[in-house]
Amino acid sequence: MSKQNHFLVINGKNCCVFRDENIAKVLPPVLGLEFVFGLLGNGLALWIFCFHLKSWKSSRIFLFNLAVADFLLIICLPFLTDNYVQNWDWRFGSIPCRVMLFMLAMNRQGSIIFLTVVAVDRYFRVVHPHHFLNKISNRTAAIISCFLWGITIGLTVHLLYTDMMTRNGDANLCSSFSICYTFRWHDAMFLLEFFLPLGIILFCSGRIIWSLRQRQMDRHVKIKRAINFIMVVAIVFVICFLPSVAVRIRIFWLLYKHNVRNCDIYSSVDLAFFTTLSFTYMNSMLDPVVYYFSSPSFPNFFSTCINRCLRRKTLGEPDNNRSTSVELTGDPSTIRSIPGALMTDPSEPGSPPYLASTSR
């Protein structure tokens, strides 16, 4: 290892490394919000999956794996936040550094893969409702999920057996995205995990919208909302991942043109990359919205909870007001009755035709 200004040799590769104080000021609050909301959303989703789903279906199995990937990514954010707060001085040793980088990469990739699978599953159920893929068993869906996890782990496991911590002056650098004069497997996967799923998600979303409009189903208010939701999912995916990918491509172009002879030219793009990289974690924070709209079990669960709260409140009112009502009127029949809708749980499932088709 050698050091000259921002120049650093990492594992035999010439790299440019920066410790920008702006990262320590700006990113920790952003990651903190992503952690809090992501933990609440995905934690609640996993709780519903594990304890409140009456039955499992293939589409729900894919959603469950998406929630697992998002949750595992979210719980790594406090360690990444501490790394930023310490201005790129990792305090927990080499093995925890590898584990954190592996978990971030694996679960970011896993989240993207299962989000893509959910889009493909929805595509077949809406556009090709009689396709044999719509009839796969829960066992087959579980096997597919395990296979996808195996691929994800295989593509990112190199982070576990490679020493990712490097001494940088008086600090320990822990990062998998240093600016180095080489095109690594990690960089290739970072680009591929965006462009390939993006193409699939855009194709599936476009075909779903076109199919619904061909059947003239898009005139229904609930179907319009479903179409809007499909578009929002695609837009959020682009907003979360495109900025960091675009900046990374810019870095590759600068490396091609200038090598690492002058590290100063990379200062601004390095700051831009790690800033936009924090947007990718926002996708895991927003995925609970996908669970809510993709399966009627989630809105039904929340409706049941709200109804139970209202029922308890309404049941308490007659007890509190009963003596007063009798005293004033002399007739207990004047006491208000509880609406029947609050006395019964909502039926399963009460969703619009399009959304219901995604969970059958």
Curated annotation (Swiss-Prot):
Comp. bias regions, Polar residues: 321-336
Phosphoserine: modified positions: 325
One matching Pfam family: 7tm_1
Positions in the Cytoplasmic compartment: 52-60, 120-140, 211-226, 292-360
Protein origin, superkingdom: Eukaryota
GO BP: G protein-coupled receptor signaling pathway; negative regulation of lipid catabolic process; neutrophil apoptotic process; positive regulation of adiponectin secretion; positive regulation of neutrophil apoptotic process
Main location: membrane
Subcellular localization, as worded in the UniProt entry: Cell membrane
Signal peptide: none
Topological category with respect to the lipid bilayer: Multi-pass membrane protein
Residue spans, topological domain Extracellular: 1-30, 82-98, 162-189, 248-270
InterPro entries reported in the protein's UniProt record: GPCR_Rhodpsn, GPCR_Rhodpsn_7TM, HCARs
Family: Belongs to the G-protein coupled receptor 1 family.
Protein name: Hydroxycarboxylic acid receptor 2
